Amino acid sequence: KRKYNLLVGERTAEQIKNEIGSAYPLDKPLTMEIKGRHLLEGIPKTITIDDSEIRDALSECVATIINALRVALERTPPELSADISDRGIVLTGGGALLKNFDKRIREETGLPVSIAEDPLASVVLGTGRMLTDFSLLRRIAIE
């Protein structure tokens, strides 16, 4: 929107993020044709964008997540810090689906990072386990 004055819908924005969005440079550059409404001319327009442009657009959100991760790591009890150092960070949720997000976090933190087998379902399943067994939550709670 800012660079091309092109307005796209939420579904298109999500598709762009999923297809060519990344948190860290890709091995092979990707491009995508985007259709939307030109804000100044008011007419439909098609442009071609590449993954680096989307990475730039996502950079502020990615940086916010990484800063929140740093804060959480700083507040982590020593015993849990040792586990994280040994086992690493497991990405879950929709953010884990962003290409190379694991590489970016690994570079920023120096910790091993992996992606859950089913990132979307793992959030729900983990929350369910915490709700049924509060002792799990107590073991990792940050005060």
What are these regions (language model features)?
Residues 29, 44, 86-87, 110:
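Active-site lining segments that contact anionic ligands and/or coordinate catalytic metals
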Residues 1-59:
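Phosphate-binding glycine-rich/basic clefts of nucleotide- and phosphate-handling proteins
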Residues 57-84, 130-133:
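Phosphate/ATP-binding catalytic cores across multiple sugar-kinase/actin-like superfamilies
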Residues 3, 7-11, 53, 57-60, ...:
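Charged, alpha-helix-enriched surfaces in structured cytosolic catalytic cores
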Residues 103-128, 137, 141-143:
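Conserved phosphate-binding/catalytic loops in two-lobed NTP-binding clefts
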Residues 6-9, 13-14, 129-143:
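Acidic, glycine/GT-rich loop-and beta-edge segments that sit at the periphery of enzyme/chaperone cores
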Residues 21, 81-105:
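Glycine-rich phosphate-binding loops at beta-strand->alpha-helix junctions
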